[in-house]
Amino acid sequence: MQSSPLLENLMEALRVLPGVGPKSAQRMAYHLLQRNRSGGVNLAKALSEAMTHIGHCKSCRTFTEEDECAICQNYRRQISGQLCVVEMPADIQAIEQTGQFSGRYFVLMGHLSPLDGIGPREIGLDLLQKRLEEESFQEVILATNPTIEGDATANYIAEMCSIHNIKVTRIAHGIPVGSELEMVDGTSLSHSFVGRRDISL
């Protein structure tokens, strides 16, 4: 049995989402058509408006509808002297939820990966260099992912910062809270020893 062209187009469109294969796309399409047509209409409207109006903050490159995001416009953030470099906009949300950081951000939109043709310009390091030259930062916190590519990216940025005599720190990686040592992989355990800190009494 051949599906209608519109149904095929809907399922194909849903497959652009990460982790959505043919079966999942079919299930979603059938659900919207059978049980939630109003939800489908709202989804289409929200997608259309987001694609049209959401761009990148001119300062930190996160997603926003304004020229500058709310964090970059916040005066208290501006005078903190701290800049946190992350790979993706979702990383900002994760850090903000901790309540431990009150500075500004710079979003790379990825990490260095020469084999994939992703070099410094592709992740905006030229724009980061410009910010380091034009603004006064006392500390740059590198919050890239604890991967080979993330570490390479962090090292590259650390060298950039050294030229400007800016303090550079890297977020600690290691043992997750609540885990047992025997269940932790060797790499994480090694990082936890290297990144150990003093206990204040």
UniProtKB/Swiss-Prot annotation:
Q: What is its biological role?
A: May play a role in DNA repair. It seems to be involved in an RecBC-independent recombinational process of DNA repair. It may act with RecF and RecO.
Cite the PROSITE patterns for this sequence.
Answer: RECR, TOPRIM
Q: What residues does the Toprim domain cover?
A: 81-176
Positions of the zinc fingers (C4-type)? 57-72
Q: What is this protein called?
A: Recombination protein RecR
Q: What HAMAP family does this protein's entry cite?
A: RecR (MF_00017)
InterPro entries in the record: DNA_Rcmb_RecR, Rcmb_RecR, Rcmb_RecR_Znf, TOPRIM_dom, TOPRIM_RecR
Which regions form coiled coils?
A: none
GO molecular function list: DNA binding; zinc ion binding
